[in-house]
Amino acid sequence: MKKKILILSGGISKERLISLDTGFQVAKELKKNGYKIKISEPDNNLEKNIKEFKPSVIFNALHGQFGEDGYIQTILEQYQIPYTHSGPIASSIAMDKEISKKIFINNKINTPKFIKYSFDKKSAKLIEQINDKLKFPVVVKPINEGSSVNVYICTKKNITKILKSMESYKEVMIEEFIAGREIQVAIMGNKKLGAIELKPKRKFYDYDAKYNTNAKTQHIIPVEISRNKLNEVMNMALKAHKVIACRGVSRSDFKFYRNKFYLLEINTQPGMTKLSLVPEIAAYKGISFIKLIEWILKDASTKR
């Protein structure tokens, strides 16, 4: 008899629509294969839904704040029901770009230089700081956000205006801009699944390039790179997965410039939409969408 799966999707983050799509795609595939499914929001009805449905596994399809930052994971561990993806600590670390980058640096994983900018401690010498430590252009991004939400490439001319528009975040990361190729690597368990290159039509692989079917981002698999370099970037992704203590699947985002890889961030709950990269990499490796989902479910546990 097939298991009963409760799928958590939606939420209140800016990635709500992506989460709903991920939940829908996973539910659709599982239903086709005979599983009993219930989709639930992470709201006040969650406990009621869990008690009434009595799921064998909870599939966490949430993205963004409260979904992949350790918050919901802490709640799920109290139910003593196996759930998918990374646990509270790994999720909170990966979601915090400042902490995760410091861990990368401490473990000799190459990552772009950065400074943290707090709006309650505004620096009159910000331009000097950037010129001294980073150089323009720079990338400005929220410290705790995913899917390239509110990520901007800034010049000396527009950075003040961009920062003004982001004051609701309280603090942001200002990172050196790395030109070059976009390489994404998927890890499955503690094994290297594969890599894919992205060629967006715009300057970088932003939210629109990721989820808009009209954005015409080119996906290249296999990556056109030497075997040694491919192994190098996949080893970096696996190392990042391990030092952050990720569980299940993860996806690491890299830039490749002047023969060097730069790890931008690691994603503990990569999307499962029709445009998502982990299912695409898995399919290239001969793992169907349902087999990928079933592996994630089998990997679930009560303590992550």
Label the model's feature ranges.
Residues M1-M95, I99, S118-L126, D299-R304:
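ATP-binding N-terminal substructure of ATP-dependent carboxylate-amine bond-forming enzymes
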Residues K2-S9, I93-R181:
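Active-site nucleotide/adenylate-binding loops and adjacent lid/helix of ATP-dependent enzymes
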Residues K31, E77, I105, D132, ...:
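Anion (oxyanion) recognition and catalysis
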Residues I37, P82-Y83, T111, V138, ...:
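Hydrophobic beta-strand scaffold residues
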Residues T155-E232, F256-Y262:
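Phosphate-binding site of ATP-dependent enzymes
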Residues E176, V185-I187, H241-K274, A282:
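Conserved metal-phosphate-binding beta-hairpin within the catalytic cores
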Residues E197-S250, E280-R304:
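Active-site "cap" helix and flanking loop/linker of ATP-utilizing ligase/carboxylase catalytic domains
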